Every structure is written in structure tokens, then in C-alpha cells.
UniProtKB/Swiss-Prot annotation:
Any one GO molecular-function label of the UniProt entry: polygalacturonate 4-alpha-galacturonosyltransferase activity
Main location: endoplasmic reticulum
Gene name, Swiss-Prot/TrEMBL: GATL1
Tissue expression per record: Expressed in stems, leaves, flowers, siliques and roots. Detected in fibers and xylem cells undergoing secondary wall thickening.
Note, other: The name gaolaozhuangren came from a group of small people in a modern Chinese novel.
Disruption phenotype: Dwarf phenotype. Severe reduction in the mechanical strength of stems and collapsed vessels. Reduced fertility.
One GO cellular component term noted in the UniProt record for this chain: endoplasmic reticulum membrane
Keyword set includes Metal-binding: no
Organism name: Arabidopsis thaliana (Mouse-ear cress)
Protein name stated in the entry: Probable galacturonosyltransferase-like 1
Membrane topology (Cytoplasmic): 1-5
Length: 351
């Protein structure tokens, strides 16, 4: 047996016995083109920063657009596409800073390397989210993907991001923008609103909570003094300063603890947000969250766009565009996501 063949056999045995972690990123992505500010973009300099701990002024700048997203191996392909879409449609892409949140159990260095290789010029930070504190509060929902502790990271942004970050746009990983995110970030929150998002008052709001909730005379009074409407938590503008002052993370956790004692809802991280904020948010034009393109939570069937203009397409629901494209069964609207997909195909890797 030749030495070369022996080495190949040994290598094969090593690969067979090496477990592949669920957090391992095996996909490779192309490098995105670099995008530059237009001439009228505001300058960000050292005077913009009021936090000596932060290395670059942009991470604390009020002139920057701060975007928060979660990162994990399962959705990294969607995250990369979302970032590309944000940058491509921005008038001031160099004034955008990304705040990524990854689970403590994830390979944060691998996630960081993936973003860096596709966007070497991007200003971003990866924050590690210790899920142990929230895991004890999570109750099972109608779809296992909704039970992932990282889905609850949006409730902890005020704790994870530096205190100097006062406002952030939170985005899910299964969406793309086709408009300038600065317009969304500039949403007027008024004198006291903590959160802004498109709300949908035609949706059957009662369906988001169980009969146990509505039949309880105390719990059912939760929305008595507000016009509560459904809103999707995948796209939100959040005033983190007001969030911190109002201790809203604790308020959400209180409802999650209640859910552990009596089942008052079925849909993961969404209902606690509705319980705390529904009827109190600043409404945003529906164009900023054309959601539901992933179908329902059970079958993920194809759906059409809602009537009206579109600034953001969101594949919330079970069906994800990258999975349907790979399976050769894409929905018509998945073709709008495909141009932002930076995944390197096996052919491209070999060439």
C-alpha cells in the first residue's frame, strides 16, 4: 500500500469520527462589493462618541444607523443576504453599524469570520448571548424553531448593546430591504413610545392567546385601556434608552414566567411582546414589513405580497427562500431574494 493511499485512508477515518456540530458553518460565501457614502452623508468623527470603551466612534454615534440582528449557523445564509440588501439600498452605507447577537453555545469566531469575509469593510460587533437565563422561561410552542433561545435575544438588546447605543433597528434574518434603511431608522417615536413597527389591526388579535388567557378575569383586562393590534417583531425600531428606563426586559420576563404556570399563548417570543407593547407602539407604514412570505407555521405555502408599495420583504413563517430554492420548489417571490444570496456553489468553489 502506497504512503499516499494510507494517508487518504487515515484522513477518511478522522472525518468519519469527527462529529459535526449544529453550530458549525459549512457554507462558504462570496465577498460582497463595497458600497460607499453619497456626497451628502453626515460625517462621523471622534466627537460623535461619548463612550471611551468603544474602539471606533461609529459604534456610539447618534448619526449612525444601528442595526441589530441575530447570528447562527442555521440562518447565516439569510443573515448575509439581509446585510447585503441593507448596504446595497443605503445612501450612506458607511454610516451603518451592525450589532450581531450569537448564542454562547455557537462558534462566535466562525460566525464573525463569515461576516468579515463577505463584508471586510463592515463595522460590526458580535455579542455573546448567554441563553441560560432565558432558557428556563421558554415554553414549547407550535413550531420547534420558535423555541430557540436566540429568538428571545431581541428582548435583551438593551442589556447586550453598549449604553451609548440609544436607538436600534432590529431585523430578522429572513428578510431583504429594497429601500434605504435610514428612512426606517428615522421613524419618529414621539414623546414616549419605546417601539415602532407596522401594526395590523385587521388581524384576529384574540387568536394569539389561549382561552385560558381570555377566560381569566384578571388577565383579560391586560388590554382594557389600549387599542391592541398585532405587530410582527421581526422588524422593529427600538428606543433602547426608554427601554432601559422602563425595565421592559423584566416586564417581558414576567409574562414568560406566567406562561410557565398557565398556558396563555402558543407562539414563542411574539406574545410577550404583544402583552407588553400592543396598542402602545408607534405605527410604521406597512411597506416596511411585507411579512408572511414564508407561509404559515405548519406548511409554509407560497403567498402573494400584500397590496401597496414595498420597502422590505419578510419570509416569516415556515418556508425560507434559500431552502425552497435548494429544493427546486421555489415560490414566485423567492426570485426576489435570490439576487442577494452570496452562497458559493460547489462549482464556484472548485473553479
Amino acid at each position: 500500500m502506497s504512503q499516499h493511499l494510507l494517508l487518504l485512508i487515515l484522513l477518511s477515518l478522522l472525518l468519519l469520527h469527527k462529529p459535526i456540530s449544529a453550530t458549525t458553518i459549512i457554507q462558504k460565501f462570496k465577498e460582497a462589493p463595497q458600497f460607499y457614502n453619497s456626497a451628502d452623508c453626515p460625517l462621523i468623527d471622534d466627537s460623535e462618541s461619548d463612550d471611551d470603551v468603544v474602539a471606533k466612534p461609529i459604534f456610539c454615534s447618534r448619526r449612525a444607523v444601528h442595526v441589530a440582528m441575530t447570528l447562527d449557523a442555521a440562518y447565516i445564509r439569510g443573515s448575509v443576504a439581509a446585510v447585503l440588501s441593507v448596504l446595497q439600498h443605503s445612501s450612506c452605507p458607511e454610516n451603518i453599524v451592525f450589532h450581531f447577537v450569537a448564542s454562547a453555545s455557537a462558534d462566535a469566531s466562525s460566525l464573525r469570520a463569515t461576516i468579515s469575509s463577505s463584508f471586510p469593510y463592515l463595522d460590526f460587533t458580535v455579542y455573546v448571548f448567554n441563553v441560560s437565563s432565558v432558557s428556563r422561561l421558554i415554553s414549547s410552542s407550535i413550531r420547534s424553531a420558535l423555541d430557540c433561545p436566540l429568538n428571545y435575544a431581541r428582548s435583551y438588546l438593551a442589556d447586550l448593546l453598549p449604553p451609548c447605543v440609544r436607538r436600534v433597528v432590529y431585523l430578522d434574518s429572513d428578510l431583504i430591504l429594497v429601500d434605504d434603511i435610514a428612512k426606517l431608522a428615522a421613524t419618529d417615536l414621539g414623546r414616549d413610545s419605546v417601539l415602532a413597527a407596522p401594526e395590523y389591526c385587521n388581524a384576529n388579535f384574540t387568536s394569539y392567546f389561549t382561552s385560558t388567557f381570555w377566560s381569566n378575569p384578571t388577565l383579560s383586562l391586560t388590554f382594557a385601556d389600549r387599542k391592541a393590534c398585532y405587530f410582527n417583531t421581526g422588524v422593529m425600531v427600538i428606543d433602547l434608552s426608554r427601554w432601559r428606563e422602563g425595565a421592559y426586559t423584566s416586564r417581558i420576563e414576567e409574562w414568560m414566567a406566567m406562561q410557565k404556570r398557565m398556558r396563555i399563548y402558543e407562539l414563542g417570543s411574539l406574545p410577550p411582546f404583544l402583552l407588553v407593547f400592543a396598542g402602545l407602539i408607534k405605527p410604521v407604514n406597512h411597506r416596511w414589513n411585507q411579512h408572511g412570505l414564508g407561509g404559515d407555521n405548519f406548511r409554509g405555502l407560497c403567498r402573494d405580497l400584500h397590496p401597496g408599495p414595498v420597502s422590505l420583504l419578510h419570509w416569516s413563517g415556515k418556508g425560507k427562500p434559500w431552502a425552497r430554492l435548494d429544493a427546486g420548489r421555489p415560490c414566485p417571490l423567492d426570485a426576489l431574494w435570490a439576487p442577494y444570496d452570496l452562497l458559493q456553489t460547489p462549482f464556484a468553489l472548485d473553479s
